[in-house]
Regions:
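Hydrophobic/aromatic residues in alpha-helical transmembrane segments
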Residues: 27, 43, 82, 123-124, ...
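Short runs within selected transmembrane alpha-helices of multi-pass transporters and secretion channels
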Residues: 148-166, 177-182, 203-216, 297-300, ...
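N-terminal transmembrane alpha-helices
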Residues: 13-53, 66-81, 85, 110-117, ...
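Alpha-helical transmembrane segments and their lipid-water interface positions
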Residues: 32, 36, 40-47, 72-79, ...
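Short alpha-helical transmembrane segments in multi-pass integral membrane proteins
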Residues: 1-26, 86-151, 195-251, 307-372, ...
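Helix-terminus/linker motif at the lipid-water interface of multi-pass membrane proteins
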Residues: 34, 38-59, 128-135, 191-198, ...
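Small-residue-rich hydrophobic transmembrane alpha-helices
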Residues: 58-118, 155-174, 281-345, 376-395
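Transmembrane helical elements of multi-pass membrane transporters/channels
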Residues: 24-43, 147, 181, 210-214, ...
Length: 459
């Protein structure tokens, strides 16, 4: 009986009307990610308002963002690389192969945790200095990161395996895992930061305790009879072909996430030369960008299983319908929110700090920084669709184009001609250029991908 109900959850990915199905799958993930975003923003707000040290503490924690992103990006190899392949396998009726993707993904997350935590502890100070920490902000950065690293495994599991819950058509269960961590974090933050007077260490402790609860929820579901795709002992053995497939497809989301870390190193390093006030401004701007990027990530988590399942099932029309809806929603949402932030920079800045100098700095650089992001929804839709369709090489190129090929060189060159404004302008130029290139590439390749799918089905 339970198996029949679980199969019904999967089958709806290939039978329900596309528009309500996508929103049914995506809205729980968007809601969960939005609450998670709220936690991140509230976290920064609390830190920024710590008496006497708020501005420097905010800059210090902002420096750690690059390292935190780099560590958590390894979960994208498993979550964004393994879950779509598991969904394709389910669409093809191959449950054993789908189970292997889940089991091997779990083992990879443990391996990534050991390697990243060890490296971060051994080289913490030089990494933080490279990321832009000054003599003033370094102590706050070290306080936060030293505690955060204790919970790396919880972060990897909760983010890396949650997408496997989505891939079996259970978005509500996946939503709860994020909500549990985010809401608990919002409650614990002021308790540890202010009541126990732990400062930034309290913020980090609240984070890892909350992520531990999320990880427990994810594992509890995946090991239970409620899951149609279960985490089983027989699949906890590395399979070279399974791991290779995950790495091939997951490299693109990993690069997309980890290059955010590389960019953080470069931007913070460039801004530190102009003063800690600009490093603090960047921390606020990155949080503002999350208002758009995090809900889009949630929407992607909802539609990717739908696209992957129907691609594996060979349903050309449903794949096309899925993309039309995704492109419209992602572009519209992204454009409207970015335009509002560009028009009202003072509101954005004042939410994070009461420092008049920092508010004035954010007002000046925010329009320069976010201008190119107005059309970034195009890239998010196209790139995530490439991932959903298993197009690893194209996804890798797109991920490299925006950050490594465009942004890093621009962030190093433009300040020589435009001063500190050049650092912020580099983001806008790279975002707009990459979005246009990605969209053109997708509309060139998409018909070829669909023809290849039809040929495979016919043969």
């Amino acid at each position: 009986m339970a198996a029949r109900m679980n199969n019904q959850y999967e089958e709806r990915l290939g039978t329900e009307r596309m528009l309500p199905l996508i929103f049914k799958m995506a809205l729980p993930a968007v809601a969960a990610q939005f609450v998670n975003l709220l936690y991140n923003i509230v976290d920064r707000i609390y830190i920024g308002h710590i008496p006497e040290i708020g501005t420097n503490a905010l800059a210090g924690v902002g420096v750690t963002t690059s390292i935190v992103i780099l560590i958590s990006s390894f979960s994208a190899i498993v979550g964004a690389g393994g879950a779509p392949l598991a969904a394709m396998a389910l669409g093809q009726g191959d449950r054993v192969r789908a189970g292997k993707f889940l089991g091997n993904g779990f083992m990879l997350l443990i391996l990534f945790t050991v390697l990243t935590s060890l490296a971060s502890y051994l080289f913490m100070e030089p990494i933080l200095r490279f990321a832009g920490a000054s003599a003033v902000t370094l102590p706050y950065a070290e306080d936060y990161l030293s505690v955060y690293l204790l919970g790396t495994l919880f972060v990897e599991i909760s983010t890396g395996l949650n997408t496997f819950i989505n891939s079996q058509g259970r978005p509500n269960i996946a939503m709860y895992s994020v909500l549990i961590g985010a809401l608990l974090n919002i409650v614990l933050d002021p308790i540890f930061i202010f009541w126990f007077d732990m400062g930034v260490k309290g913020a980090a402790l609240a984070t890892i305790l909350s992520q531990a609860c999320s990880a427990w929820w994810v594992l509890g579901f995946l090991c239970s009879d409620r899951a149609s795709l279960r985490l089983q002992k027989c699949y906890l053995k590395f399979d070279r072909r399974i791991v290779g497939g995950m790495l091939a497809l997951g490299v693109s989301p990993f690069i997309m996430a980890s290059t955010e870390s590389l960019v953080g190193f470069v931007l913070n390093g460039s801004l530190e030369k102009f003063g800690d006030i600009y490093v603090g401004a960047l921390a606020i701007l990155q949080s503002a960008m999350q208002l758009v990027s995090v809900p889009l990530t949630g929407f992607a988590q909802g539609f990717v299983p739908v696209a992957s399942y129907n691609y594996g099932h060979g349903d050309r029309q449903r794949v096309k319908d899925c993309f039309r809806i995704v492109l419209t929603v992602m572009f519209s949402f992204n454009f409207v929110l970015m335009l509002l932030m560009i028009c009202f920079p003072t509101v954005v800045a004042s939410a994070f700090t009461s420092d008049p100098e920092l508010i004035a700095t954010v007002e000046h650089v925010l329009p320069l920084f976010l201008a190119g992001m107005t059309i970034f929804g195009l890239q998010r839709a196209c790139q995530n669709m490439f991932v959903a369709l298993g197009q690893a090489r194209i996804s890798i190129f797109i991920a490299l184009l925006r950050k490594v090929i465009l942004l890093v060189p621009l962030a190093l060159v433009l300040p020589r001609f435009c001063g500190v404004e050049g650092v912020f302008m580099a983001e806008a130029v790279s975002d707009a250029t990459a979005a246009i290139c990605c969209t053109l590439l997708f509309f060139w390749q998409f018909p070829k991908i669909l023809r290849k799918m039809q040929n495979l089905i016919q043969n």
